[in-house]
Regions:
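ATP-dependent adenylate-handling active sites, centered on carboxylate activation for C-N bond formation
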Residues: 45-46, 59-267, 277-279, 283-295
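Short alpha-helical scaffolding segments that buttress acidic/His motifs in well-ordered protein cores
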Residues: 13-17, 163-164, 267-272
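Short linear sequence motifs
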Residues: 9, 22, 243, 258-260, ...
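N-terminal segments that mediate ammonia production and transfer
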Residues: 1-66
Length: 295
């Protein structure tokens, strides 16, 4: 098995335990990684030659100070609408609709552009999301659409095992119930579908800059841990037998690759490039085991 030839890195494991993802990396293994941010690849089919260059500045763009907020908002709306229009396809379009603003915005854009879609939601076994389902039903009624509500049962051990198998532990196990949701949708649409979600909207809809000025790397590090660490780094480091300082040094070294000297923008960029790209991507990748999924 290929796993027998790979090396688990204790530092990466500790970072994952504290952050729920590994900043700047895609796996726990020393030998396997994802492409660096802003990577461009050119492949020559005739010579079987692959060339790659990384230009992080293409991904980490500092906001232009002084521009009117209304103009920025108009640009965001225009871009958002263009993306939604790109989903005009012959595949059935299923919008996983919750009570949140994110998926509601997608629903509004599709409706405005006369792109047909099926609003679909799940009701968990404990009925903890019943208020979300109620709001989603009201939105569906407003748009004169039939709301497909999928009832979930209590998760079985095989759902957790399947999620671990599919994502090798890189997707949070408590979301195993989402596999049941996807399986039931696939049973209704066995010929495939386009599955749309509002995942990641919290990176667009809210203010990403820190609520206080960060003047240096120490302030950045302390603020990052206070806002994002799930498990204290001291505990994560102890579990995997590494110095806590190693985690700090890794994060700061990775942060130094961001093409900006402003620590406030470094923080916002980290939320987009790390939490969004590492955490949200794994859920998106999970969905694509079942059908085409976009967010």
């Amino acid at each position: 098995a290929i796993s027998d030839q790979l090396t688990l890195n204790p530092l990466f494991m500790a970072l994952y335990l504290s952050n729920a993802y590994i900043p700047g990396r895609g796996t726990f293994y020393q030998e396997i990684d994802t492409l660096a941010s802003g990577t461009f690849a050119i492949y020559d089919w005739l010579t079987d030659d692959l060339q790659m260059i990384s230009q992080p500045n293409m991904r980490f763009v500092e906001p232009l100070a002084g521009r009117a907020e209304k103009k920025r908002l108009n640009e965001l709306v225009e871009t958002f609408m263009d993306v939604c229009v790109s989903y005009r396809t012959k595949l059935p379009k299923l919008l996983s609709l919750s009570g949140g603003m994110d998926s509601r915005c997608v629903a509004g854009a599709l409706q405005q552009k006369s792109i047909d879609f099926v609003p679909i939601s799940f009701l968990d076994f404990q009925k903890e999301v019943k208020d979300d389902v109620l709001i989603a039903s009201q939105i569906a009624e407003l748009y004169h659409k039939s709301h497909n509500v999928i009832q979930l049962s209590l998760c079985e051990p095989e759902h957790y095992e399947k999620l671990f198998y599919l994502k090798a532990g890189l997707n949070y196990l408590p979301v195993a119930m989402f596999l049941q949701y996807l399986e039931k949708i696939l049973a209704q649409y066995p010929q495939s579908a386009l599955f749309l979600t509002g995942d990641g909207g919290d990176k667009v809809m809210r203010y990403l800059l820190p609520d206080k000025e960060l003047a240096d790397e120490k302030q950045w590090l302390n603020y990052w841990y206070s806002q994002n660490a799930i498990i204290p780094t001291k505990d994560s480091a102890a579990i995997f037998g590494i110095p806590e300082k190693a985690m700090d040094e890794y994060l700061l070294n990775h942060l130094s690759t961001y093409p900006t000297g402003n620590y406030n923008y470094k923080y916002a960029s980290a939320i987009l490039a790390e939490r969004s790209a590492r955490w949200a991507f794994e859920g998106e990748d999970r969905n694509r085991y079942f059908f085409r999924s976009e967010t």
